[in-house]
C-alpha cells in the first residue's frame, strides 16, 4: 500500500483554484507530487487548477510539498476541481460542480487512495445575509461527498477568509466575510475529522480579493499542519516565512531538473541548444 498514490480532492472557489502571480515565487517541482489531468496522473506543474486562463499559484503545491517532507515514501495526488467565483449554492448536492468533483474523485480512486478533502470557499457568499444558512449548506455538501465517495471519516480541511476583504477592489463588497468565517469555524469545530485553518496575516493581490503567491505558500503549509496533526490552526505557524524559503531551496533530482528544462524550452524561455547543453549537465 505504500506505493499507492495518496490523493486529495481540491474544491472551492478562486482562492482554492489559485490566483497568485506565478512570477512572484519560485516553482515547486517535485516528482513525488502528481496532479490529475486528462484522466492521467501527471507530474505537478503550476497552475494546478486551470479553471480560468488567469489561474496561478494556489495552496495545493506547498501543501503537497509539505506532505512529501513528512512522508518519505510514496506519491501525493492532487484532484483539482475548484471553480472561481462559485457560490456555495453551486456546490450543492446534485449540482454541476458537485457532480464533477465526485466524478473526478471516483476516477482518481481507481488507482489512488482518497486521503483528504481541502475546501476554501465563501467570498461569493460574504454579502447579502448569505451567512445565515451557510452552515447548513456546507454540512449538506460535505456529508454528500463523504457518502458518495464511501469515505465517512475522511479528513476535511477548511480555510478561513482573509481579513483584507471588504476594503478595496473586487473584495470591497465582501463585507460579511467575518460572519462566514464564524460559520466555517463552527462547522470545523463541530464536525468529526474537520479542521479549520485561519487566514490571519495573509496578503492579497492588488485586486483586493485573491490571496497572493507568497501567502498561498504559507496557507498550504497551514493546511498541511491541520491535516497532519489533526488540529485547528488558528494563526500563523512558527517560523512560517523561513519554512516557505525552505520549500524554494530544495535540491532537485535529475528527473525534476529535466522536467523543468523541458518546460522552459516548451515555453520558449530557452533554446533547444541551451536545453541540450543544460540537460547534459544533469547527467541525463
Task: Please tell me what each predicted stretch does.
Residues 1-284:
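Cell-envelope and extracellular/periplasmic
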Amino acid at each position: 500500500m505504500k506505493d499507492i498514490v495518496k490523493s486529495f480532492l481540491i474544491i472551492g472557489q478562486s482562492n482554492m483554484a489559485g490566483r497568485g502571480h506565478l512570477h512572484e515565487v519560485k516553482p515547486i517541482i517535485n516528482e513525488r507530487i502528481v496532479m490529475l489531468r486528462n484522466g492521467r496522473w501527471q507530474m505537478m506543474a503550476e497552475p494546478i487548477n486551470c479553471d480560468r486562463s488567469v489561474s496561478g499559484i494556489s495552496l495545493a503545491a506547498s501543501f503537497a510539498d509539505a506532505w512529501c517532507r513528512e512522508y518519505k515514501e510514496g506519491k501525493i495526488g492532487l484532484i483539482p476541481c475548484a471553480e472561481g467565483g462559485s457560490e456555495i449554492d453551486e456546490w450543492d448536492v446534485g449540482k454541476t460542480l458537485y457532480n464533477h468533483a465526485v466524478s473526478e474523485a471516483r476516477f482518481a480512486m481507481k488507482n489512488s487512495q482518497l486521503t483528504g478533502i481541502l475546501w476554501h470557499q465563501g467570498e461569493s457568499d460574504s454579502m447579502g445575509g448569505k451567512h445565515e444558512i451557510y452552515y447548513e449548506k456546507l454540512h449538506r455538501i460535505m456529508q454528500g461527498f463523504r457518502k458518495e465517495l464511501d469515505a465517512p471519516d475522511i479528513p476535511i480541511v477548511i480555510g478561513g477568509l482573509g481579513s483584507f476583504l471588504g476594503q478595496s477592489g473586487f473584495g470591497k463588497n465582501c463585507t460579511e466575510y467575518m460572519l462566514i468565517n464564524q460559520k466555517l469555524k463552527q462547522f470545523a469545530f463541530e464536525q468529526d475529522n474537520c479542521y479549520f485553518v485561519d487566514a490571519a496575516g495573509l496578503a492579497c493581490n492588488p485586486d483586493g480579493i485573491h490571496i497572493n503567491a507568497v501567502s498561498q505558500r504559507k496557507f498550504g503549509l497551514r493546511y498541511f499542519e491541520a491535516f497532519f496533526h489533526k488540529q485547528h490552526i488558528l494563526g500563523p505557524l512558527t517560523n512560517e516565512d523561513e519554512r516557505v524559503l525552505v520549500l524554494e531551496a530544495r535540491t532537485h533530482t535529475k528527473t525534476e531538473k529535466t522536467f523543468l528544462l523541458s518546460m522552459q524550452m516548451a515555453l520558449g524561455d530557452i533554446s533547444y541548444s541551451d536545453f541540450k547543453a543544460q540537460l547534459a549537465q544533469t547527467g541525463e
